[in-house]
Every structure is written in structure tokens, then in C-alpha cells.
């Protein structure tokens, strides 16, 4: 699929592999991390080998998160692939997820363009908060959505997919 539609960087949050590692195929490099004992909650980056020369990795010690750094012009780009628990998860698990993300944000140079990739299981609603969320958020804001919005405000982040209208699913 990455060849047919020319994807240079693909961040995947639904990986069912165990452990951490790297794989090489003909045209792509794969950097992955997953739990040691369960085949769930893993993530990976699939990178076209043409841009691999522009890639540096910071491999955090947590199994569910990865950070990829890419040299670019006029700015470098940092992509964080993060695991966030579902809305049914215990609060301690959600707290740990956000703490782990805070740790990754500290590793990110302030001059980099930052992209955080994940399904947040959050409904942020359509109220829109200037500089944080747009008016095209999903549904009515839930507790997880409020937590994400608060996190974005504290860290000066924007939930980009709420800034434009999505197709109905």
C-alpha cells in the first residue's frame, strides 16, 4: 500500500508484534515497538528508504511510544507515535500515558515541527477553542476529550484534525 499511494512516512498505532526492533524490505525501513508479552498496543514507523538518510531516531524506554526525527527544510520534523488507552482504561493508565508523552515532548527541539500521531479515543466537541481546537471536533466533548484539550493548552499544541470538516463515516 505504501508504494501504490507513495507514502514516505507511515505511523501505525495498531501493531500486534512483540518487543522492539528494525526491519528492512526492498523499499522501506520499519522501526517498531510493542509489549514484550502481549500482542497489542504496539506502534511502528514505516519509512521509504529514499528519505531514510534524513532520519534520526530517539528510542524511548517505554514500549508503547516512539519518536522519529527527520531533517527537513526550513524546519526539522519530529513525529511522536504514542499509545493512549481507551476510554474504559483505568485513570492510572491514562495518567501514565500522558506522563510518557510529556517525557517525549521534552526530547523534542522547540524549533521542530511536531506531529503527534494516535487515536486519542477523545471527543472534543464542536465548541472550538482558539489556538487549541477547531469547530469540527467529533460529537459532544467527553472526559477524554477534555483531558486532551487541557493537555494541548498546557503544551501549546493544536488538535489539527478539528480545524477542518471531515467526511461523515
What are these regions (language model features)?
Residues 1-169:
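A shared catalytic/ligand-binding motif for oxyanion handling
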